[in-house]
Amino acid sequence: MQKRSGFTLVEVLVVLVMLAIIAGTVAFNMSGSMKATKIRAASKDLVAALRYTRSQAVVKHAEQRLMIDVENKSYQAPGKKKVTFPEGMELKVFAAESEVPSETQAGFRFFSDGSSTGGRVTLLYGDRFWRINVAWLTGEIRLFKDTEV
């Protein structure tokens, strides 16, 4: 009897099942990494907008305010277009009472000496969160990832 070269049906099916498992695992991991990328980018964009607002207050020797609309999940720096956060992202804003004109809006005011009204923004996306702290005395803006303090 001659030996035939090639693969049996069982061998081909085993390989296909293994490929399906690997593809499923990769797709699952990619979805988590996409969320991580989106929340990191949104957080860094908001930090950049806050720092821009602070620098404009110092350069122009005049108060400047960045407004956050919690209901519409957006923010606007002075003289800039409104920026909307990605779909599914949640916001929690803690700001000075004087900078909260309504339940759905809050702001961060920066003064000509660089100081601010201070506060905190927490961005939540799935099981991930980033926090932005704005120091009232110095106006320093710091970004903290997930579990950092």
Regions found by a protein language model. Give the residues of each.
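N-terminal leader/signal peptides at the extreme start of proteins
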Residues: M1-F7
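N-terminal helix-rich module
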Residues: Q2, L13, T25-R51, S55, ...
